[in-house]
Amino acid sequence: MLGDGNEGMATIPGFNQIQFEGFCRFIDQGLAEELYKFPKIEDTDQEIEFQLFVETYQLVEPLIKERDAVYELLTYSSELYVSAGLIWKTGRDMQEQTIFIGNIPLMNSLGTFIVNGVYRILINQILQSPGIYYRSELDHNGISVYTGTIISDWGGRSELEIDRKARIWARVSRKQKISILVLSSAMGSNLREILENVCYPEIFLSFLNDKERKKIGSKENAILEFYQQFACVGGDPVFSESLCKELQKKFFQQRCELGRIGRRNMNRRLNLDIPQNNPFLLPRDILAAADHLIGLKFGMGTLDDMNHLKNKRIRSVADLLQDQFGLALVRLENAVRGTICGAIRHKLIPTPQNLVTSTPLTTTYESFFGLHPLSQVLDGTNPLTQIVHGRKLSYLGPGGLTGRTANFRIRDIHPSHYGRICPIDTSEGINVGLIGSLSIHARIGHWGFLESPFYEISERRVLFLLPGRDEYYKVAAGNSLALNQDIQEKQVVPARYRQEFLTIAWEQVHLRSIFPFQYFSIGASLIPFIEHNDANRALMSSNMQRQAVPLSRSEKCIVGTGLEQQAALDSGALSIAEREGKVLYTDTDKILLSGNGGTLSIPLVMYQRSNKNTCMHQKPRVQRGKCIKKGQILADAAATVGGELSLGKNVLVAYMPWEGYNFEDAVLISERLVYEDIYTSFHIRKYEIQTHVTSQGPERVTNEIPHLEAHLLRNLDKSGIVMLGSWVETGDILVGKLTPQMVKESSYAPEDRLLRAILGIQVSTSKETCLKLPIGGRGRVIDVRWIQKKGGSSYNPEMIRVYISQKREIKVGDKVAGRHGNKGIISKILTRQDMPYLQDGRPVDMVFNPLGVPSRMNVGQIFECSLGLAGSLLDRHYRIAPFDERYEQEASRKLVFSELYQASKQTANPWVFEAEYPGKSRIFDGRTGNPFEQPVLIGKPYILKLIHQVDDKIHGRSSGHYALVTQQPLRGRAKQGGQRVGEMEVWALEGFGVAHILQEMLTYKSDHIRARQEVLGTTIVGGTIPNPEDAPESFRLLVRELRSLALELKHFLISEKNFRIHRKEA
């Protein structure tokens, strides 16, 4: 990472490097480790022995390409072959064969996997590292209780605690605890060995009474006592081999296997020298832990911070895949054992080929990628989303936390996160703080710990330090880029030391950071002037950049941070030259390259759909006849320009109120953004249908569909599938399909049968089950795929997929956002002549609410806005590093004002920079031509169009389904649901006195079954709709629920006459 010639200079690592390193570690080490664990398998008579020869395993290159795997819904994987031998002990013969044991999914160049045609990615998980941790809690009397928690490699926990009388207990369950002497004796130590291996033997002897001596008199007695407490069994259990096996399986295996990481942590914490190859908890560990617990009781030793990253480990791609491979080998072992016994029973001669099946490995990985919480579908909204998804860190998942149980302390930022986990980038909502993102330079070490690089000043080299190690050094904060080394060495600088901030002389500094963005994730590093923003708004910006839609014509940002090119390059979306050569031919779908005596055809991505329905497309940026070098960019992708990430557009913005249309973060825009396709994007929707073989026969795809109007079938070809290039509207048939059915003549009404007999209509033997275009799906058909699988059975159906492209201009209801957490909904589209205009006559494109800045404390947008205006006038682009105040005070403001002043001079426009109100200008009302009373901030920020679009959200219900229990309309757009009129909505309607509307909402349009039917009848016949007289279904449901609680509701009328009668009787 550090070159010899330029000391102190560091390069940014590949953003997908963590995924690649994890998968390579699994292939190089993890496979062999698990294969070596595979045992020798013998039959019951011990005549035949089966074993694997691990030294000769091999992975075969995949037979299909990545694109073909996606197209044909297959898994991009490699076949694993291992040599296996079958030994007959009687004749000492051995048969050896190379066997196929299954497919292992391969990682592609994007750091993702292709499983059943879907791009999936594995998320890194943060777990508590195995080892021992000491903490202190106050009991109900306010006295400190010290406990030591031993965490195993499996995630099981055992606790040691010391009471007021300095007695040490091992807690085996929430309610049961036993003496540590019993636990040590059950693990194989006698009293003499215990007293010899502890530092405080007199304390152990102090609570040793006769009853305790009897319990630890022998190992068998200790095991019986331990089993009685652990299993909570009464009576007197008898010592047996099965009892020991049960204890071994349920307790020792789950709670006492530390693993190599746990053994390392235990040795370090307790100053032990137990060999690393001994992964199990030993009596010596228990006694050393008890000694440390006694020391804490008497004020010696330190407690552990459970949230420190030195006490966490990363479960990476390698660990997840290795665990699943081990699980598959266990299943394979059971299958081989059963097959051998079956072959011997039926007197067959087995071979290694016959004994091994590929099903366990293949099905294990398929279920893992399909069901595991840490295996997620790749989010492909834009190139930034793809690269950020693989760098996520999650506390959730198997063995981790849940959103309900995680407390605030776990979610909070910790000093050890510095340079390892981004303090900004996390999810919003219930998982805040539980899903984080890796810092740019962080890497996962060999032991699963997060490491961060620092520059060692004395040795002039870059060090990668583990969590906790940097606390022993004085680390200068933010001194990576110095304008003048001599000036820097004389100054007093802020530094970190033992999780505290100090101000020390430069000579006392040991380490310094190597990069200004070292502490942030990729998303946060793309925010210019981030130091001027509130952290909550920066968090929103990091998330919203991942929701930006690729536009039809992308544009570079005028004000950036310098990481845009690296982010685009590592996303894998660009087409990169793999060798030198000359461009022979360029087209929209390929580039021909000559070099090294051959011609290379490089295919380009054309109108490919992402899983968020955005359009992924590559555009050539090299010309015919040009010579290119290896690593040069051949084609731009969606949302990139010139190899730089380009998610939005630089538009002219004014911060001012306008007739209330930008109230509460609403945004007013010009019609220019619509007519000139500034924010136009393409979206590709996928519609699919399957053809099955039913009990009545196979389903047919045809264009001859009875009882359907001809114009609905106008786009179908001879085979019944929509033609490429067709324009389709809502309700059109995309795929014509008929499903066979058996209909008896007796099932029809008599008048139907009479009409059929008179008109000669035959009984239909099939029903129409066509694929129809749903509401909001209008567009152009760009691709049709008929995936025909072998067999064609009902379990292996054929599938037809139709891809339709939509062109969406920006409209009222769409969501736009800047890069500083400033988001809003389009409220009105004004004509150009009505928009406020500048002193040079240019109308602004957007009007933002100025009240959205001071309360949100995201002042960075003001700097970006003004600097963007100066850059557009000077035709310059700026790349701003964060925390530029380390050079001088008010550096950001000085830069912006100097560029505005220069733009004002060069363009001869004095309104660009006015000394009375720098950054602001007087603008005019487009409707009247009069200037506004106050000067207004104008500029050119970078504004994104987000995936939250009104076309995907707007919905109306005319008819639809009702819930079975409440008989009220379903909820949700996908179910054609209705809009709920709740309690507060009813109050609002009551306030306006709209009795009839209120009655309709609560009866006819909701859950009054009889009233609904009467409305339908009277609408068809014509007449007055009767008022409902009985109770709606929801009230009936309430009555039934009360009855289930043994409460009966009755009603009766009380008149004055009845009241007097009841009063006399009383």
Curated annotation (Swiss-Prot):
Its EC number is 2.7.7.6. SUPFAM superfamilies: beta and beta-prime subunits of DNA dependent RNA-polymerase (SSF64484). Its main location: plastid. One of its GO terms (biological process) is DNA-templated transcription. It is found in: Plastid, Chloroplast. Pfam families: RNA_pol_Rpb2_1 (PF04563), RNA_pol_Rpb2_2 (PF04561), RNA_pol_Rpb2_3 (PF04565), RNA_pol_Rpb2_6 (PF00562), RNA_pol_Rpb2_7 (PF04560). CDD domains: RNA_pol_B_RPB2. It catalyses: RNA(n) + a ribonucleoside 5'-triphosphate = RNA(n+1) + diphosphate. GO terms for molecular function: DNA binding; DNA-directed RNA polymerase activity; ribonucleoside binding. Keywords: Chloroplast, DNA-directed RNA polymerase, Nucleotidyltransferase, Plastid, Transcription, Transferase. It comes from the Eukaryota. One of its GO terms (cellular component) is chloroplast. Belongs to the RNA polymerase beta chain family. DNA-dependent RNA polymerase catalyzes the transcription of DNA into RNA using the four ribonucleoside triphosphates as substrates. In plastids the minimal PEP RNA polymerase catalytic core is composed of four subunits: alpha, beta, beta', and beta''. When a (nuclear-encoded) sigma factor is associated with the core the holoenzyme is formed, which can initiate transcription. This is DNA-directed RNA polymerase subunit beta. It comes from Coffea arabica (Arabian coffee). The gene is rpoB.
